[in-house]
Amino acid sequence: MSMTDNVADMLTRIRNAYKSKLISVSFPSSKIKTSILDVLQKEGYIKDYITTQKNNISYTEVALKYSVNGDASICEIHRVSKPGKRVYSAIKDLKGYYNNMGIYILSTPYGVMSDREAHIKNVGGEVICKVF
């Protein structure tokens, strides 16, 4: 079965794993997925992730993060820019998501980064997803 949107598949797997209270989730690996996971880890939404090779296919396993009382660190995670409709934004047009409690993840000429980092570097780009 071929997927047309690998990033949306990854986000859906993470969202469903949090709803099921799983400790970890795995999916096929790619460079863009790894870049998004780097941002999520840096922002404190996931614990860690590792990439493993199995039958010549790379898989990424993500260790999910929960609070002390068992609440998920990610309440919402949604794809913004889709293969059929790309969404680009200048940095001045990106306002804080959920009053700066959430983040946008952007693909910029300087790599994949959060909206906070993009504000510091004063660069816009494709809005991949939003996380709260």
UniProtKB/Swiss-Prot annotation:
This protein's GO cellular component annotations are: ribonucleoprotein complex; ribosome
The lineage's top-level taxon is Bacteria
Recorded hits in InterPro entries, A to Z, give:
Ribosomal_uS8, Ribosomal_uS8_CS, Ribosomal_uS8_sf
- The UniProt transmembrane annotation reads none
The molecular function GO annotations come to: rRNA binding; structural constituent of ribosome
Any one Pfam family here would be: Ribosomal_S8
Signal sequence bounds: none
Query: What are the BP-aspect GO terms?
Result: translation
Alphabetic keyword roster:
Ribonucleoprotein, Ribosomal protein, RNA-binding, rRNA-binding
Its function, per the record, reads: One of the primary rRNA binding proteins, it binds directly to 16S rRNA central domain where it helps coordinate assembly of the platform of the 30S subunit.
Entry's family note: Belongs to the universal ribosomal protein uS8 family.
Q: How does it assemble?
A: Part of the 30S ribosomal subunit. Contacts proteins S5 and S12.
Name the record gives this protein: Small ribosomal subunit protein uS8
This chain's source organism reads Rickettsia rickettsii (strain Sheila Smith)
